[in-house]
Amino acid sequence: LECYEAYADQFVMAERMKEIIQSCAKAVGTERVETENGTIDLFGEWKWVGVYPGLSEAVGVEITPETDASVLREIAEKHEVDIDPKWDAEKLVTELFGEIVEPTLVNPTFVYDYPPSAQPLARPHRSGEPLIEAWDLIIGGMERGTAFSELIDPVIQRERLTAQSLLAAAGDDEAMELDEDFLRALE
C-alpha cells in the first residue's frame, strides 16, 4: 500500500497508513492475525526502527552512514547474504536490513531513515544527516506499505535521477530512469 497527501510529511502519512489498515481490520472483524511467524496485533504498539540502528543491533556492530562498503561486505558474508560486489554502501545497508532485520519484524513496524539511494523521490532528512525522510511499513516480516516526505527541490531531484539512470544503464533493475518531463514540471 502506498499513499500520499499534499503537504503531508512522512509522519502524517504513517498515521494515515495506520488508520487505513486498522479501519480495514475493523471492517473484517479482527484485531489480530495468526501467521507462521506469530500473532500480528494490528491494534498494539506500532514501533519505529531506524535502518542504521536496527541493522547495528541485529549484527552487533555499529553501522552508520559513514560505514565503509568493505565492512558491510564482510557482514553480508558472515550472515550469508547474497550481494553484488558492485553495490555501494547505501545499497548494501538497504539489502542487509531487508535480509537480516526485516523478516524478524512481526508486529507493525515503520522502518525509517533510509540512505538517499533507497528512494530517490524522498526529501533529504530535516536533521541534515545523510538520510531521507521515508519509511516502509513491515508487518509479518514483509513490506506492506511505504511513504515519504516528497522531494520538491528540482536540483537535488535531477542529481538523484541522473545517478539512478546511470545505475539503470549499468544493469540495476531497481534503479529509476531519468524523467525529463517530471524534472521540468518541478522546475
Map each language-model feature to its residues.
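Short, polar/flexible loop-turn hinges at active-site or ligand-entry regions and domain interfaces
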Residues: 7-11
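Hydrophobic (often cysteine-bearing) scaffold residues that line and stabilize catalytic clefts
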Residues: 13-17, 89, 93, 153, ...
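Metal-assisted phosphate- and nucleotidyl-transfer catalytic regions
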Residues: 23-142, 161-187
